[in-house]
A protein has these predicted regions:
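Carbohydrate-active enzymes and regulators
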Residues: 1-163
Length: 163
């Protein structure tokens, strides 16, 4: 699969997969991981994050859980902050931000175990008090791709195949 086909697949999965986690309270996000290769994958997956950080807020650790609710190793890597006065929204509009806001860019790296070839799996992420260190850090961009999604109902389950 080429990069554009993977992006289209991630868009489709983000719209169709049930990204809710039963019994989980609080603010969390779903992480849809796609293995577009012909081999099973065990290793690090990386979500590249670019988000506004409110004035007075500080970066904090994150945690990631499997679809079965097992917490897995996860670390924030390559964290960088810069002042920002406005933010471009997904629809292309620009929203002014309060004084003191910052842009936070980082890589959310987490461990994926045994993701079958040409399959996807949904993980849950949330802010945390601590991180579980990864057994190894990625030296190159992993072959799997990750898309963040807000929790919503969908007709597809937490893991499945494609193509």
């Amino acid at each position: 699969m080429d990069a554009q086909a993977i992006e289209r697949l991630l868009d489709e999965l983000a719209a169709r997969v049930d990204t809710r986690f039963e019994g989980v309270q609080g603010d969390y996000r779903a992480l849809i991981v796609v293995n577009p290769t012909d081999a099973p994958y065990t290793g690090v997956a990386v979500l590249h994050v670019d988000m506004p950080l409110k004035a007075g807020s500080e970066p904090r650790p994150a945690a990631v859980w499997t679809p079965d609710g097992v917490r897995i190793p996860c670390q924030i890597l390559h964290s960088r902050l810069e002042p920002v006065a406005e933010w471009r929204m997904p629809d292309g509009s620009v929203r002014p931000l309060p004084d003191g806001s910052r842009r936070w860019r980082f890589d959310l790296a987490f461990w994926v175990d045994g993701l079958p070839p040409r399959c996807y799996r949904v993980y849950r992420s949330a802010w945390s008090a601590d991180e579980l260190p990864l057994p190894t850090l990625p030296a190159t961009e992993p072959p799997v791709r990750v898309r963040e999604a807000i929790p919503h109902p969908g007709e597809l389950g937490k893991e499945g195949g494609f193509g």
